[in-house]
Amino acid sequence: MNYVLNLPLLVLTLSLVALWLSEAIGASFRKRRNLQESEREGFSLVAAATLTLLGLIIGFAFSMAISGYDQRRSYEEAEANAIATEYNRSDLLPAEDAARVRALLRNYLDQRVLFYETRDERELRKIDATTTQLKTDLWSAVQGPAVARPTPVIALAVSGMNDVLNSKGNADAAWWNRVPGPAWGLMAAIAICGNLLIGYGLRNSEGRATLLLVLPVVVSISFFLISDIDSPRGGLIHIPPQNLTSLSRSIYGR
């Protein structure tokens, strides 16, 4: 299911087909047994309640997706600030250790920029492995001076490095924070039920075929937008590493 949700265009296509078929099935039921006028009022009430519930669930999912997007963007900025702060605090270390820390931070920054820009899964695994090793090296680079000279000044550099490593963990957690699968399942189930009811309850008219497309298109576009915003790498809407890239240009003088 995660694979599908990471491809918003596939979500759009599948939901449009499924919802249109649901309305068509509802319309076929109506041909077998048409609604009586005495039943139509109660049926309209049920259909309206179902569509209202669908709207509420879509709004809830959209709110979650936007919240996750904003969280990922905030943690990208926090990562850049933490790396910049530690890069400056490296001057507090002995000259040899400071040079090593700055070199490692530059490499680490490059990997974080690649993490945000890369879409290839195999390349991402390489980036993750390299980043994990760099985190170990970065901590070792400040651990040695801290053990040798446990002064308040050195402690500032250690604290800054701790912020760098923690900011990466916070960013990862934000990327994993997605709209839950059960919420998607509930939305799909209610949408299918709603479209079945619409197909069953729609009266015969010349424009019936066109009307049958309206709700599936609207709901499918909503699903597409939620999936696009919620997927960190899929679709059209991504988190550009603006702050990390700006920091990289500043450090490298580009």
Which role fits each region the language model picked out?
Residues 2-33, 173-254:
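Alpha-helical transmembrane anchor segments
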Residues 26-34, 54-62:
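Short alpha-helical hairpin
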Residues 36-51:
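Loop-to-helix transition at the N-terminal end of transmembrane alpha-helices
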Residues 50-61, 214-222:
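Hydrophobic membrane-insertion alpha-helices, especially the h-region
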Residues 57-77, 230:
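Transmembrane signal-anchor/signal-peptide helices with a preference for the extracytoplasmic
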Residues 76-93, 240-254:
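Short extracytoplasmic/periplasmic juxtamembrane "stem" segments immediately C-terminal to an N-terminal membrane anchor
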Residues 86-175:
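Structured inter-helical modules in multipass membrane proteins
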